Amino acid sequence: MTQEGKLEQQFLNYLHSERNYSVNTSTAYENDILDFRRFLNEQAISEYQQVTFLDVRIYLTELKQKSFSRTTVARKISSLRSFYTFLLRENVISENPFTYVSHAKNQLRLPKFFYSEEMEALFQVVYEDNETLTLRDRVLLEVLYGTGIRVSECAGILLSDLDTSYQAILIRGKGNKERYVPFGAYAEDAITDYLSSRTELMIRFKKEHDSLLINHYGDPLTTRGIRYCLTKIISKASLTRKIHPHMLRHTFATDLLNNGADMRTVQELLGHASLSSTQIYTHVTKEHLKSTYMKHHPRA
């Protein structure tokens, strides 16, 4: 391994052990750093210590020429600034060339969410029969929409995480932070109907584990597997616009705020470390209010 490769690995270890970043987040950092190293190799720059502010400006120009979105460019800058801050802390460099790099302010991109008619179509798919995998998909949809948890968090739910007496689930979120989220009667009924079928399937394939959600072989359902299941549900519902599974989380937050929930509660339910991450949904609800007004008021 080269010296540069060792520095990269030390940084990734730091993100995992000291910052408690998830594998997905660490991988995003790694990809951004490797892309920058590719650029440095093309510029005949062999060491991170040799990078100057001018080199960084050239790199940013290249990113813009490749038509990366503002969000992607901002993320790459943030990743590399963090990496060089780490190198500075480790006395590998004496100055961070990313310190004074600015970027165009990100355009506000409102989260997309499902409309009520679309949610009804999704639920019709998972209530069409009582086959084991349909029951599982019913749990999947009821839990994701009913709690607002991330797909990756849903994949990690164990039977021991369910507290049926309080109708709450222990969730392990980003940075291994734990929180309890409540679930409603629909999710509770879906889980109850599913558990006996889950047991039968696991006995058939001689599986023993505590994961709530399983695939057709009785193995734990992965994050990728959940996305695949949701994509199939969305396809069966014949929804025409471009949509993605994470919209269930957006829909959860938007529906809560539209129906009067306070911001702090929604923040806690979503597991957001900062209130600013939750405030994006207020823009969605304002758009909802405006569109409703424009549609229904006679003087709009």
UniProtKB/Swiss-Prot annotation:
GO terms for cellular component: cytoplasm. Gene3D superfamilies: 1.10.150.130, Intergrase catalytic core (1.10.443.10). It is found in: Cytoplasm. Pfam families: Phage_int_SAM_1, Phage_integrase. Residues 109-294 form the Tyr recombinase domain. GO terms for molecular function: DNA binding; tyrosine-based site-specific recombinase activity. It comes from the Bacteria. GO terms for biological process: cell division; chromosome segregation; DNA transposition. The keyword Cytoplasm applies. InterPro entries: CB (IPR044068), DNA_brk_join_enz (IPR011010), Integrase-like_cat_sf (IPR013762), Integrase_catalytic (IPR002104), Integrase_recombinase_N (IPR010998), Integrase_SAM-like_N (IPR004107), Recomb_XerC (IPR011931), Tyrosine_recombinase_XerC/XerD (IPR023009). Keywords: Cell cycle, Cell division, Chromosome partition, Cytoplasm, DNA integration, DNA recombination, DNA-binding. Residues 2-88 form the Core-binding (CB) domain. The active site is at 150, 174, 246, 249, 272, 281 (o-(3'-phospho-dna)-tyrosine intermediate). HAMAP family: Recomb_XerC_XerD. Forms a cyclic heterotetrameric complex composed of two molecules of XerC and two molecules of XerD. Belongs to the 'phage' integrase family. XerC subfamily. Site-specific tyrosine recombinase, which acts by catalyzing the cutting and rejoining of the recombining DNA molecules. The XerC-XerD complex is essential to convert dimers of the bacterial chromosome into monomers to permit their segregation at cell division. It also contributes to the segregational stability of plasmids. This is Tyrosine recombinase XerC.
